[in-house]
Structures are given as C-alpha cells and as structure tokens.
Design a protein with these regions (language model features):
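Anionic-ligand binding patches
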Residues: 1-146
C-alpha cells in the first residue's frame, strides 16, 4: 500500500500477533502532490537511493511544490483491534538543497518557515516537533482511558 496508515496498521498488527501483546508502531510518509504522492511510505528506501538533487530534478518542470508529511501512530492488540492516530503537515519543496541531513531534510520547508528543515535552529525544530507530539498525546489519553 502507498498509504502510511495502512502500512503502520499492518506492521503494528503483525508485531502484536507475533509478540502476543499490544504494540505501538509509528510510520511516516512524504507525499509530493505533483509526483502522484511519491515517495509515500517508502521514505527510508528513497533516502538510501536518491539524493536531494535527484528529487529536485524530478520537480524541475513542475509548478506545484506542495508536499504532505503524514505520520501514523498505531496501537494494535493481538486480537486484531487497532487504533490509529494521524498527523498531516503541509510543506513546500525548495528549489535547491541546503544544509546537511537526509534527502528530504535538505529540501522540505515546513509551513511558516522560509528555509529547509536542515537549516532550522533547535527552537524551530522543537516548534515543529510539538505539532507531531499531538498524536502521541492522543495515544497516551486513549491508553489511560482504556
């Protein structure tokens, strides 16, 4: 599946059944609108196989530079029960790479920023991370109420 929610759910369920205990699994996907949602949940593979320049070359004739960052945190039980917590952030692809880091760190500009993630200060990264933590808070509340 190209849907990070389905990947997370499948992985969590597989692990819960294999271990015979509840598990929590997180998966992340980056979806470039102009490239039909590429690379989707295949981020690790893309980071190993392509450079930031490769991605920018794919985008050189494209006007829409929107990219969606989708994280799914899945709680799964061996009996098949799952609960998903999803965060989606809109970002923009830069026109040139900058800084150090992963393939996408050098070219993804978070909403409200004017430079790629790789150039963020610790304070800016913390601001972004707080948005992502919402799904972890939701998961914690769910587990407490269970």
């Amino acid at each position: 599946s190209n849907d990070v929610v389905e990947v997370s759910k499948y992985s969590a369920l597989y692990a819960a059944k294999k271990l015979n205990k509840p598990v929590i699994k997180s998966d992340v996907g980056y979806y470039i609108e102009e490239l039909g949602g590429f690379p989707g949940p295949f981020l690790k593979y893309i980071n190993d196989m392509l450079t930031s320049k490769d991605i920018l070359n794919m985008m050189k004739t494209k006007n829409n530079r929107k990219i969606y960052l989708k994280e799914c945190l899945t709680y799964a039980e061996p009996n098949g029960f799952t609960k998903e917590f999803i965060n989606v952030e809109e970002a923009t692809l830069a026109t040139k790479e900058a800084g150090n880091g992963s393939t996408f760190d050098k070219i993804v500009i978070f909403e409200g920023d004017n430079h790629p993630k790789s150039l963020n200060s610790e304070k800016e990264n913390l601001k972004h991370f707080k948005k992502v933590l919402v799904i972890y808070d939701e998961c914690a509340k769910f587990l407490i109420s269970k």
